[in-house]
Amino acid sequence: MDTPAVRRWFHRTGKRRVLVFVHGFDTRHDEAVFRFAQLVHDTGTDFVPVLFSWASRGSVWAYDYDKESATVARDALERVLRTAVADPGVADVTVLAHSMGGWPAVEAVRQMAIRDGGVSAKLGNVILASPDLDVDVFRGQLARIGRGPRFTLFVSRDDHALALAKFVTGGGVRLGAIDPFAAPHRAMLERQGVDVIDLTAMSGGDSLNHDKFTKSPDVVRLLGERFLAGQPVSDAHVGLGDRVGAVLIGTVGSVTTLAVGAR
């Protein structure tokens, strides 16, 4: 990693907030660039955008290859995050990871906690959209991280890509497909202070229901106006009329209907 170049990029726009996006499985570099550029445009966020691109083969038949590549990438991602939080010109850092990208993202934060005895307060939010991550592994990662960034999950029980990942991995429950109300997940989420947005009742916009967080205008607006602005949904009343069964389980175990319109 060219650390001086990364630092120059942080300072290029004069903005003090950094958004690091980690793409998911079966995503070539050009596809990741397009997706992130579209997301930055649609959310209208006031961030320095940083795409962390790892070596996906870009094939649905290369799951094991991509998982190994994502694992290798966690050290480089840790260096990017460490560079960001150490820069005096950076005020806060948000990580947004999709699908398999959630694995190196949480691992990088875990490694920071191990090396430093904690995570910098500048790393304020980690948002995992449709995370392809074993739920028990995630529980262990959070235990090791301890007091750290706010974690937010976008989940959907009808995510067919994660259903296939569960089969490929031998039946391990994928974090992005949990029922946040069901035991033992709810207790874990409450105990760890994890916020969860359940998008199951929404149409997916794609045949696999794996990209709901970018396909729904309401969810994109929610990302831009609240999460990426550092304002958790639990801090504000939201209302758009028609509702679906989206929920928030926050640090005090509250459950709130979110303003995400049906499609």
Located regions from the model:
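Gly/Ala-rich beta-loop-alpha elbow adjacent to hydrolase catalytic centers
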Residues: 77, 96-105
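The conserved beta1-alpha1 loop
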Residues: 20-24, 98-99, 130
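Serine-hydrolase catalytic-loop signature spanning alpha/beta hydrolases and amidase-signature enzymes
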Residues: 26-28
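Alpha/beta-hydrolase fold active-site loops
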Residues: 17
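Lipolytic serine-hydrolase domain surface
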Residues: 4, 10-13, 33-49, 53-92, ...
